[in-house]
Amino acid sequence: MGRPLIESSSNDHVANFNRKTKKLIDQALEHYNGRLPEQLENFSFENFVEVLDTESSVVNRVFEVLVREVAGSFRQRKRAHMPRTNTTAQVVQRQLAPSISTVFSRDSNDPLVDDMDQEYIL
């Protein structure tokens, strides 16, 4: 009869992700190659895929940051569609919660190093 709807939807998301990822990589490669001296060979998409190491801590960190940024955008968009009363209640609740600056404020007249600590520094 056909594929189940969930599988079809999942495949659509994978295809959409692949299109978006390819576009982002192509744009980054174009920017990168545009800055290369003429005597150097351009870095291609094929080179990128071949060399990309999914076990690299740097690559994993880049993707963690990317996921965090996209999730933040998603939450902001979702918050924009929330009813006004929920948003107002959340703002009031956040204003009532102490912030780090109010909990750990320092008197500007206090020295950064105590007299007792000064002995150990010298």
UniProtKB/Swiss-Prot annotation:
Protein name per Swiss-Prot or TrEMBL: Uncharacterized protein C8D2.11
Which GO terms of the cellular component aspect does the record hold?
cytosol; nucleus
